[in-house]
């Protein structure tokens, strides 16, 4: 099964447009009456869809593109399935959070995205091991995927707080910031650095790692 990187990147940009529209809606509700959606629910939908449907989806696509360039005979069937599953869950969270906020459906969908992340890490680690050990991107991508999985601890605890109605502001903020820290400063940055180093030879001809 072939991998159409242009299709997946265009779809990720469509998701970015949806994220932007939700952002505009939230700001509109601050100054004007729009009773059809709860501001808090839209905020949850915006953040979850931005992370899963836009940023994570786009980073997955770029990481897969990197691995394909290193192995043209790579079977991308599992990666296509992972991207489809992640996309379905992202849109599911978009609608479930918008209408219900934290509910059984939205919690299940957010949990599934974590499972998907684990599957992606499993397959990607296997394919990374087939690449030349001198490639500097390998270590960055491995660290990025580990941070992505570690961040799920915050998500699980946040889901527990919301499902049990046992709200504690300190633990709520701790779980949110734990997740955000390992996403922003871990998964996102380390993936971007891995992508940067993968193109260093093209961007800076004098830079050589092999």
Spans of features found by a protein language model:
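Hydrophobic alpha-helical transmembrane segments of multi-pass integral membrane proteins
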Residues: 1-210
């Amino acid at each position: 099964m072939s991998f159409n990187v242009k299709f997946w990147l265009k779809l990720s940009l469509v998701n970015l447009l949806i994220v932007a529209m939700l952002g505009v809606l939230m700001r509109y509700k601050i100054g004007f009456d729009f009773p059809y959606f709860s501001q808090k629910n839209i905020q949850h939908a915006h953040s979850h869809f931005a992370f899963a449907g836009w940023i994570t989806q786009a980073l997955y696509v770029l990481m897969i593109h990197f691995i394909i360039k290193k192995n043209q005979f790579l079977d991308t069937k599992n990666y296509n399935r992972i991207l489809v599953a992640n996309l379905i869950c992202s849109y599911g969270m978009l609608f479930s959070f918008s209408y219900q906020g934290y509910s059984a459906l939205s919690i299940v969908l957010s949990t599934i995205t974590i499972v998907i992340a684990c599957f992606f890490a499993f397959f990607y680690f296997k394919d990374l091991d087939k690449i030349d050990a001198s490639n500097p991107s390998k270590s960055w991508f491995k660290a990025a995927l580990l941070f992505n999985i570690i961040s799920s601890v915050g998500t699980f605890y946040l889901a527990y707080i919301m499902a049990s109605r046992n709200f504690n502001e300190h633990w709520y903020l701790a779980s949110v910031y734990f997740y955000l820290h390992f996403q922003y400063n871990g998964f996102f940055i380390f993936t971007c650095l891995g992508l940067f180093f993968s193109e260093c030879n093209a961007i800076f001809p004098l830079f050589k790692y092999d």
